[in-house]
């Protein structure tokens, strides 16, 4: 690459996408072990990849309000946004993702899959058994801490 092309490449600004992701934590009803809810994308470039459920912030929306709305829309479930456990920044090839990862508890509903292909409850042993999307991989150490301390 020439110096000019390097400067040009570095000056290209990636599209910024800001999302909230729900870390829905529960105790397994049979084993009492802590586990989190993971979903498999059912559409788009990342179809088939696993993620914590969530979606894009709307203008003027807080990450907490966003995650409550997104889980209602995607999973027909009401959650309480408890606290942000981390913020992930990741550069995909065509956009920069900022993901607010929010610990959530279920208030009501049965987590119906309205947009996802599949879902699983994962514990500390099975957490890394699915093919996580690259940005979601970055929050796994924090999720592991939650699963150990819960």
Tell me what each language-model feature is.
Residues 11-36:
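Conserved N-terminal beta-strand and adjoining loop/helix that marks the start
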């Amino acid at each position: 690459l020439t110096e000019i092309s390097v400067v040009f490449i570095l000056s290209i600004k990636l599209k910024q996408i800001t999302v909230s992701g729900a870390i829905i934590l529960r105790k397994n009803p049979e084993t009492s072990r802590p586990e989190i809810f993971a979903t498999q994308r059912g559409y788009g470039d990342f179809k088939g990849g696993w993620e914590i459920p969530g979606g894009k912030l709307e203008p003027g929306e807080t990450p907490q309000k966003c995650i409550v709305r997104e889980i209602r829309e995607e999973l027909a479930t009401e959650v309480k946004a408890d606290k942000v456990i981390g913020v992930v920044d990741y550069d995909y090839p065509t956009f920069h993702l900022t993901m607010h990862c929010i610990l959530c508890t279920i208030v009501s509903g049965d987590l119906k899959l309205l947009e996802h292909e599949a879902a699983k409850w994962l514990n500390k042993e099975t957490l890394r058994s699915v093919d996580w999307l690259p940005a979601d991989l970055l929050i796994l150490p924090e999720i592991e801490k939650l699963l150990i301390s819960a």
